[in-house]
């Protein structure tokens, strides 16, 4: 009891807003051992989806996840590595293209909505579908996520010729780490940046407090109990964090992803704008203006305010309720099962809670400290690789990581 009280009161005051749920007090990442089969090496690996099995085990229970490794990163969708390589080698961009890049669950859908509204006029009638994905019939203005749309192992929903025929401005989405980003391929980050400059593509990269991103991905991706996954209960958050901080989740390690894209955004006249979820949350009008400026779009204060209104969490959740999409039912069921506080009617895990600092409801103070320590040490390694001091990101609530 005394230990519990100590743990609760020793919550890291700098990174811990209110809302801690005492039922999570015992979460401890150290009790989980993580395994990768086959062991992940640093060389670029190309294996089909499901070829890598990752798991967290405490000796009594084992929680598995599986991914394909394409270009050395765990692919979020079933991907055919050969198709992916072909896509990488042949895709052509235009200088009117805009890409929203991110590590998953950091506010991609939100920034897509902002970009689409900025480009096409903040007109409610435009109504970019709640999850903004391109669809020839339903949402021809939507974002194109080239990697799964073209390189899917099961079926491609778009050919490269169809992509080439889309009218400007095309909006793309990608979760690729910088060195695997389409159109960049170079032997160094500088060479990749030079390639990116040549394409004329403008990129908005959005980052988020990694703990909020980890929780958000947990509610979308951590496997459900049942025969298929051979687990009796949902994976506990500490097991998830053990995998997450190792990069054994969709799109690999958060830190490498963010640090590298951040470094590229710091180059002189970089085509990449780095924004955080938290800055958008704190001052949406300022964030939307920053994005408009990066895209070279002159917009009045009235236009900006209209974009802010139509990209608010409530406005987007209302859209999602009107237009549920395939997969939403599964996600809603999952989020409800796992107490993810999603509005079952809105049925979209892409619009689950929309808060900053809400990770605190799901972490114990100990888990929070362990997560911070893992973050800091992997950030130090990533920064050393990039040849600079570790960047510090202000994730709001006095949380600088
Ligand atoms: P939560 O799961 O914490 O609610 P992505 O689009 O990259 O998958 O990110 C999804 C996360 O962004 C979800 O976080 C979602 O609720 C949040 N989000 C989406 N639209 C938002 C908006 N307009 N305002 C704030 N958060 C938003």
Task: Please annotate each region the language model reported.
Residues 107-121, 274-299, 307, 315, ...:
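PAPS/PAP-binding and catalytic site of the sulfotransferase fold
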Residues 308-314, 329-335, 388-401:
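Amphipathic alpha-helical surface "interface" segments used
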């Amino acid at each position: 009891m005394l230990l519990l009280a100590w743990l609760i009161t020793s919550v890291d005051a700098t990174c811990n807003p209110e809302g801690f749920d005492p039922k999570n007090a015992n979460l401890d990442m150290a009790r989980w051992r993580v395994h990768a089969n086959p062991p992940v090496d640093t060389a670029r690996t190309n294996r089909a989806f499901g070829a890598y099995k990752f798991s967290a085990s405490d000796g009594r229970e084992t929680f598995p996840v599986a991914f394909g490794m394409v270009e050395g990163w765990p692919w979020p969708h079933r991907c055919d590595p050969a198709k992916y390589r072909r896509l990488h080698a042949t895709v052509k961009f235009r200088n009117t293209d805009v890409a929203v890049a991110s590590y998953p669950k950091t506010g991609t859908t939100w920034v897509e909505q902002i970009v689409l509204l900025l480009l096409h006029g903040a007109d409610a009638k435009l109504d970019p579908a709640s999850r903004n994905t391109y669809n020839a019939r339903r949402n021809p203005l939507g974002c194109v996520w080239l990697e799964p749309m073209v390189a899917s192992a099961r079926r491609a929903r778009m050919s490269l010729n169809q992509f080439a025929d889309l009218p400007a401005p095309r909006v793309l989405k990608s979760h690729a780490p910088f060195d695997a980003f389409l159109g960049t391929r170079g032997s160094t980050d500088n060479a990749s940046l030079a390639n990116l400059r040549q394409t004329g593509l403008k990129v908005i990269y959005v980052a988020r407090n990694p703990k909020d991103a980890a929780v958000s991905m947990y509610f979308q991706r951590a496997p459900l109990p049942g025969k298929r996954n051979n687990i009796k209960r949902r994976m506990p958050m500490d097991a998830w964090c053990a995998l997450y901080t190792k990069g054994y989740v969709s799109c690999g390690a958060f830190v490498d992803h963010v640090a590298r894209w951040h470094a590229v955004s710091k180059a002189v006249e970089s085509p990449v704008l780095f924004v955080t979820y938290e800055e958008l949350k704190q001052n949406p009008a300022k964030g939307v203006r920053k994005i408009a400026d990066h895209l070279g779009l002159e917009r009045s204060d009235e236009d900006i305010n209209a974009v802010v209104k139509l990209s608010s969490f409530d406005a987007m959740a209302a859209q999602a309720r009107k237009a549920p999409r395939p997969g939403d039912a599964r996600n809603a069921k999952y989020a409800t099962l796992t107490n993810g506080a999603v509005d079952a009617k809105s049925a979209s895990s892409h619009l689950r809670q929309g808060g900053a600092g809400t990770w605190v409801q799901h972490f114990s103070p100990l888990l929070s400290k362990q997560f911070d320590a893992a973050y800091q040490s992997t950030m130090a390694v990533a920064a050393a690789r990039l040849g600079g001091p570790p960047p510090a990101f202000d994730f709001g609530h006095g949380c600088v990581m």
